[in-house]
Amino acid sequence: MLCVMAGKVLHSSLTTPFLGNITHHMASEDHGWNLILVNHENYIPADYEVQLTELSNGKKVDSRIYPELQEMFNAARAQGYGLFVREGYRTQEEQQQLMNEKIEAYENEGKSKSEAKKLAEQWVAIPGTSEHQLGIAVDINADTTKSSRDDVYNWLEENAHTYGFIKRYPSNKTDITGVINEPWHYRYVGKEAASAIYSQGICLEEYIETLE
């Protein structure tokens, strides 16, 4: 069961400490809030606002995706799958902390600072480019006392689009998304877009191109 507690968050100014030589610009909301494209080249606008709903485990999501998220979880649980939201909305500061910790971990393994940054960015989104900062992406894990990870991930991959969610980083689209396969990371795009992305076997970047 998810519970509601709303609050308004205004993002602070974004920094780009791990940008390197990547050309970037602020993400466009031209196609609507649900289709805003955030990746290594598209930063979250500094004035982006999100109204949050708190889940029963303390994680938060954009209030606009809450009904479909609850509906999807109800459907999965009705079929015997145990699952929960491991990660939801993150602040700029929380994303920066994750990056710092990953870099430090690689440095502790003997990697140089530049090597550690490069490796960390393969696993952790550069602050300002994480969909978790939008509040419309969730990391969903299996309750392994009830279901295996593979069973939950398979169910999500086959059914999430029905509720407006997509597997954001498929294994066969890494060259486009710039992110390795993440079977737990689901992003809300709305039912129409999710169905098109699923049926065509494309990723969000490719779908956005069809709208241009």
How should each PLM-predicted stretch be described?
Residues 1-212:
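Extracytoplasmic cell-surface/polysaccharide-interacting catalytic and binding patches
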